[in-house]
Regions:
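Short, intrinsically disordered terminal tails adjacent to the first/last structured region
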Residues: 1-12, 570-571, 599-606
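Alpha-helical transmembrane segments and immediately membrane-proximal extracytoplasmic
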Residues: 1-465, 469-470, 474-475, 479-491, ...
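Acidic/proline- and glycine-rich, intrinsically disordered low-complexity segments
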Residues: 469, 528-533
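The conserved cystathionine-beta-synthase
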Residues: 479-496, 503-504, 522-525, 543-570, ...
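Flexible loop/coil segments at beta-strand boundaries within sensory signal-transduction domains
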Residues: 505-508, 571-575
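Short, solvent-exposed cationic patches
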Residues: 532-542, 597-606
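Short beta-to-alpha loop/turn elements within the nucleotide-binding domains of ABC transporters
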Residues: 466, 483, 513, 530, ...
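Short hydrophobic beta-strand motif reused across regulatory alpha/beta modules
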Residues: 407, 510-518, 577-585
Length: 606
């Protein structure tokens, strides 16, 4: 064989092979490669974050209810009041001074960042939310891990996107990836974690988003398995549908779960409103909430020696699944948990609503099951079956997320025996709750802030993404109440404005003064010896908060007709931060259009 011609032969064949069209194809284009790698990184980060967060809660819980409570044995059960109050003493200042978006249950804050800020979340949220929520849960706060880990994972995804200087659309996707990974790792539920991110956060099921989110969820779940092993959140006995007639009972329970879910949502925000009226410093409110929570804990402690309304309450849920709780206990714990959760979050605590929703759903279902079983003992399954279905039905009604509710219960329990009643009750609950209230517990919080989620999720409204803080004029000419009208006339002449904000000595907004009133007095020749306070025409003007979208200011301008809308602090003090005029809104809108065009151009290049 002549080997001397081998190099030429190889070269000839290589040229022929390289000429084939398929060699010019790529398995992944640049965009897909970027999303694959970044979603993998976010999955690793959120998985590790979820493991650390869970271990931090366990460590703090042991510190609080073993070490500290052990030192207070002679004061039992007063330690149930002191420990939640101590937790509140840490949570309040931590949230108020370092990251106020860490207050509450977390998911609405993520949705707000996706809608208003292109998914950009401050890096400090990772640390503050981790500490605040772990302290709150460990000290007895009636909240869950789902909201915090969703926000923590989302913040990690946002950080990755910002560091790599990705476009807004990609940052949003990575935020959803982080949330999916956090939930998957926390609850051993990768499918539900991915669906939660798509159904609740992104509100769309596009193939591009689905692939990235699933990669993050699976990666995070693998990380959690490596450190903590493969274990179900809840153990359940074997349940089955005893009779087709039971489906009618499950349908009725789904309706009741929907009404209870809507009631919970409204009571939660009613509690927030009531706490906002209490005139004490904001950082101290969680202390008061902790004291009141402790009183509820003592009530539940008297039943069987355990404060079942504290924390996530998974042990109590599992007891209800095995039908180990009496009718009186399930009904009593339903009411106590409702009060405990609204107290914790209303007073400024930090934690999610998923675990409390499962708890209340289990207690509602257990109560319904006890009653149904006592009436139809031969044909109705034990109360534990109704508790299991009630968990999904209640959360579906609260979050308006039936697919997530069904899947997460499957993955947390591993029980597929009563799939029909579970799906039926959850869908019925979601339909009824949507008819009673158009907003879920997440979107209602945003609506109260003036944030309306875009109906067309494929093209997010640019005006929705521009906040008052981004657009406002901070260097506005604010005038004092005691300013002489002659001086006010000079101020109007130099600024060419038709209305100016009036402030008190402490910089709080007193109202608006317009040039119309000043012109009337000038024509009458009575400007001398009079002050702004004498002609203050608009004493209670419509205002806007820094985090609210500027389209709200446009609406106020139309209603008020005074030419400017004051921007005031969120603390309730009405401290003037700036003003919004039509020209400010137009400038900010033009800037947003330009940035969106640059992002689209950047995507086309990649």
């Amino acid at each position: 064989m002549n080997f001397s011609s081998l190099p030429k032969t190889i070269s000839r064949y290589w040229k022929q092979i390289s000429s084939f069209e398929f060699t010019r194809l790529r398995l992944l284009d640049a965009d897909s490669s970027v999303m694959l790698l970044t979603s993998l990184i976010v999955g690793i980060c959120s998985g590790v974050g979820a493991v650390l967060f869970r271990n931090l809660i366990d460590w703090l819980q042991n510190l609080a209810y073993q070490d500290i409570s052990g030192l207070m044995q002679e004061y039992y059960p007063l330690h149930l009041i002191l420990i939640p109050a101590i937790g509140g003493a840490f949570v309040g200042p931590l949230v108020y001074y370092f990251a106020r978006e860490a207050k509450g249950h977390g998911v609405p804050e993520v949705m707000e960042s996706l809608e208003l800020r292109g998914g950009r979340i401050r890096p400090r949220v990772v640390v503050v939310k981790s500490l605040a929520s772990s302290i709150c849960i460990a000290s007895g706060g009636s909240v869950g891990r789902e909201g915090p880990i969703a926000q923590i994972g989302s913040a990690l995804g946002s950080i990755v996107g910002q560091v790599l200087k990705l476009s807004e659309d990609r940052v949003r996707t990575l935020v959803a990836c982080g949330a999916a990974g956090g939930i998957a790792a926390t609850f051993n539920a990768p499918i539900a974690g991915a669906v939660f991110a798509l159904e609740v956060l992104l509100r769309r099921f596009g193939s591009v988003y689905f692939g990235a989110v699933v990669i993050s969820a699976v990666t995070a779940d693998v990380i959690a398995h490596y450190f903590e092993g493969d274990q179900r959140t809840f153990l359940t006995p074997d349940y089955a549908l005893n009779s087709p007639w039971e489906l009618l009972l499950y349908t009725l329970m789904g309706m009741l779960a929907a009404l209870a879910a809507v009631g919970f949502s409204r009571l939660l925000y009613f509690s927030e409103d009531m706490w906002s009226l209490i005139r004490v410093p904001e950082p101290t409110k969680p202390i008061l909430g902790g004291i009141m929570l402790g009183v509820l804990g003592i009530f539940s402690f008297q039943v069987d020696g355990f404060p079942r309304v504290f924390g996530v309450g998974y042990d109590t849920i599992e007891s209800s699944l095995f039908s180990q709780l009496t009718l009186q206990m399930t009904f009593g714990l339903l009411l106590l948990k409702l009060l405990a959760t609204t107290l914790t979050l209303g007073s400024g605590g930090s934690g999610g609503i998923f675990a409390p929703s499962l708890f209340m759903g289990a207690m509602l279902g257990g109560t319904f099951g006890h009653i149904a079983h006592s009436i139809f003992p031969e044909t109705v399954a034990p109360s534990g079956a109704y508790a299991l279905v009630g968990m999904a039905a209640f959360f579906g009604g609260v979050a308006h997320a039936p697919i997530t509710a069904i899947l997460i219960l499957f993955e947390m329990t591993g029980d597929y025996q009563i799939i029909l009643p579970l799906m039926l009750a959850t869908v019925v609950s979601t339909i009824v709750s949507r008819n009673v209230s158009r907003d879920s517990i997440y979107t209602l919080k945003l609506k109260r802030r003036g944030v309306v989620l875009s109906q067309d999720t494929q093209a997010i409204d640019l005006m929705q993404g521009v906040t008052a803080e981004m657009a406002m004029n901070r260097e506005t000419e604010a005038v004092q109440l005691d300013m002489q009208l002659v001086e006010l006339m000079s101020t109007f002449s130099s600024t060419h404005y038709h209305a100016l904000p009036v402030i008190k000595q402490n910089s709080e907004l007193a109202g608006l003064v317009t040039i119309k009133e000043l012109d009337l007095l000038r024509i009458q020749g009575s400007l001398e010896s009079k002050t702004v306070a004498d002609i203050l025409s608009v004493k209670d003007p419509q205002t806007i908060l820094p985090n609210q979208p500027v389209w709200m200011a446009l609406r106020h301008l139309e209603d008020q007709g005074e030419g400017c809308v004051p921007v005031v602090a969120e603390t309730g003090s009405k401290k003037l931060l700036g003003v919004l005029r039509r020209i400010d809104i137009i400038r900010s809108y033009n800037k947003a259009v330009s940035e969106r065009a640059q992002d689209q151009h950047h995507d086309e290049i990649l």
